[in-house]
């Protein structure tokens, strides 16, 4: 097995320019593909998840011209030209869920599949929502999970569509992005949420990007969403992908644990991503944080004793960035509790179980529940722990931070960061110092 040995490091400082946001990149690619006109996308993330989206769009007949981190997408005016396609989408939820919805109304015969873990990640609530408007979608293996077979359906919207909100916000994102292309009786489509909607900031990203392409969604709280029906997306001409706020979390934490000053560029006060809220969680733990419109800087911890304060917080809004807090909790002066993180269980791996297992390897006492994690840091970190990453990019990036505790750490299968941040370890090593 490939591995990477990091540290021991005693400090981290410098400036890092973030790669483009995964969440924004894949949404913008699909919106541009469905729009009228050409869209020039800049700062597009180059990673496994964006590559599978680009490959799929190419197979569906979308004209794409790539040059570095710029991509010109020629829109299809709401309908893909290819009426049959076999689409392998890796482990990219941001590709599988929205594309499934777009294909369901495209009147073609499609197969959607991915890596084995993708076939364990739920999609049943989205399929149920699409079947309510007449979509023909069959499960090839297990009910509620990919691979999927999508066939032409008689699509009509004559009642509100109901979808669960407590498993993944990507189901709602997929419906919101697709439904404006469908004709409806009274010229509008309504989506109603059953239960609590998780990861609300990601829905905010979807709505704001749809608006850039000329379609406005109105929401009544977080339970009811109304969009115009039978309309076309219009290209904004140019759109820049802001830096990835989830990826920023590792460097911001490094600036706290390694003394800083460490500045990330590409996200800040003006960001549309909820994960910039990670900076607030770090501040609650005692880190010195300052922020501009498109930068955030951390200068160590504001205590003489050099330890973070423990935190007890609901992370429903920022589940991805919360993983970084779980590792930062190793450097706290007491026990931290991460609450409302049930969605971790259906991500790239079961992140609650994986995080608990690997935190114990470095000496922490960990209690895991259905939707929470309690982390008590050790007196001193266990050196030379071999961290398993479960083919999960965020596990690998999170546990790089252990090396800032003055102990070496081994990261198994470091290439899994290719999902969102292929050169992460090079960037991290450039900022960390012995």
Curated annotation (Swiss-Prot):
Cited InterPro entries: Enolpyruvate_Tfrase_dom (IPR001986), Enolpyruvate_Tfrase_sf (IPR036968), EPSP_synthase (IPR006264), EPSP_synthase_CS (IPR023193), RNA3'P_cycl/enolpyr_Trfase_a/b (IPR013792)
PROSITE patterns: EPSP_SYNTHASE_1, EPSP_SYNTHASE_2
GO BP annotation list: amino acid biosynthetic process; aromatic amino acid family biosynthetic process; chorismate biosynthetic process
SUPFAM superfamilies membership: EPT/RTPC-like
Catalysis performed (reactions): 3-phosphoshikimate + phosphoenolpyruvate = 5-O-(1-carboxyvinyl)-3-phosphoshikimate + phosphate
Cellular-component GO terms for this entry: cytoplasm
Active site residues of this protein: 320
EC code: 2.5.1.19
Location within or outside the cell: Cytoplasm
Pathway annotation: Metabolic intermediate biosynthesis; chorismate biosynthesis; chorismate from D-erythrose 4-phosphate and phosphoenolpyruvate: step 6/7
Keywords: Amino-acid biosynthesis, Aromatic amino acid biosynthesis, Cytoplasm, Transferase
Domain of life: Bacteria
UniProt GO MF annotations: 3-phosphoshikimate 1-carboxyvinyltransferase activity
Annotated residues for binding of phosphoenolpyruvate: 22, 93, 121, 170, 351, 394, 419
Record has Zinc-finger as a keyword: no
One Pfam family it belongs to: EPSP_synthase
Residues binding 3-phosphoshikimate: 22-23, 27, 168-170, 199, 320, 347
PANTHER family on file: AROM/DEHYDROQUINATE SYNTHASE (PTHR21090), PENTAFUNCTIONAL AROM POLYPEPTIDE (PTHR21090:SF5)
Function: Catalyzes the transfer of the enolpyruvyl moiety of phosphoenolpyruvate (PEP) to the 5-hydroxyl of shikimate-3-phosphate (S3P) to produce enolpyruvyl shikimate-3-phosphate and inorganic phosphate.
Family membership: Belongs to the EPSP synthase family.
Subunit and interaction comment: Monomer.
Protein name: 3-phosphoshikimate 1-carboxyvinyltransferase
Organism expressing this protein natively: Burkholderia ambifaria (strain MC40-6)
